[in-house]
Amino acid sequence: MTFEIVFDSAREFESLIATLEKFFDEAVFQVNMEGIQMRAIDPSRVVLVDLNLPEMLFSKYSVESEEAIAFDLKRFLKVLKLARSRDTLVLRKGGENFLEVGLLGDENTWFKLPLIDANTPEIEIPSLPWTVKAVVLAGALKRAVKAAKLVSDSIYFMATPEKLTFKAEGNDSEVRTVLTMEDPGLLDLEHKMTKAKSAYGVAYLEDILRSLADADEVIIRFGFDIPLLLKYMVRDAGEVSFLIAPRVEEGRS
């Protein structure tokens, strides 16, 4: 057995994979002594996803050596959707070219999923001149995105030292969601004294935020017409980060 990894909530792992599956049909995961990592750019080249699940997140983490494994996320997600609320997830790999997936609870169910070619280019995360860093509750950001969707498929992120604004404009309508430090949805706001306004696709944000609970904290960084960094934690130790390309539109105000 080259590795055996146990996560105590199959349902929670399902939510994580469901988010990844929105952007990728298949994915390559690096499994090593430190944990599980994945970094990839979606086929549209709009979203870069960076996943890091350290070994401390798992109730059992036994890895003999570092290796890359790749598999079909849609098939994996279908398996995870069978999990009950108290089921434990077991992932293991032996000498065969399969990933064994176990759902252990009132019944113990095992699947073998075929592994595929794990070749993938190395992807560097760029250092960007972000001028805004904010910590918001996922529920507040979800509602801002939902409101924007009513009038446009793009949403502007804007900031001043006092407030964070989400704005969308349609042919004959406009919506704004404004958060200040007096509002429960905005936990922290840092703003450099430069212009900060960028537009991003509503659909991408919806897919990222869908699996988060309203009380989850989300870190966002943006600036002027540069990619948005959106990051949230997995049990205070793991991290999932998304770098989303901006929509640069001519003639906007």
From Swiss-Prot:
- Which PROSITE patterns does this one have? PCNA_1
Against CDD domains, the record matches this protein to: PCNA
Pfam name, any one: PCNA_C
Spell out the SUPFAM superfamilies in the cross-references.
Answer: DNA clamp
Query: Would the keyword Mitochondrion turn up in this protein's UniProt record?
Result: no
Q: Which GO terms describe its molecular function?
A: DNA binding; DNA polymerase processivity factor activity; identical protein binding
* UniProt record, GO biological process: leading strand elongation; regulation of DNA replication
Q: Which domain of life is it from?
A: Archaea
Please verify whether the record's keywords include Plastid.
no
Kindly state which keywords UniProt assigns to this record, in alphabetical order. Answer: DNA replication, DNA-binding
Q: Which InterPro entries match?
A: DNA_clamp_sf, Pr_cel_nuc_antig, Pr_cel_nuc_antig_C, Pr_cel_nuc_antig_CS, Pr_cel_nuc_antig_N
Q: How would you summarize its activity regulation?
A: Inhibited by interaction with the PCNA inhibitor TIP.
Could you tell me what this protein does?
A: Sliding clamp subunit that acts as a moving platform for DNA processing. Responsible for tethering the catalytic subunit of DNA polymerase and other proteins to DNA during high-speed replication.
- What protein family is recorded? Belongs to the PCNA family.
Question: What is its quaternary makeup?
Answer: Homotrimer. The subunits circularize to form a toroid; DNA passes through its center. Replication factor C (RFC) is required to load the toroid on the DNA. Interacts with TIP.
Designated name of the protein: DNA polymerase sliding clamp 2
User: Which organism is the protein's source?
Assistant: Thermococcus kodakarensis (strain ATCC BAA-918 / JCM 12380 / KOD1)
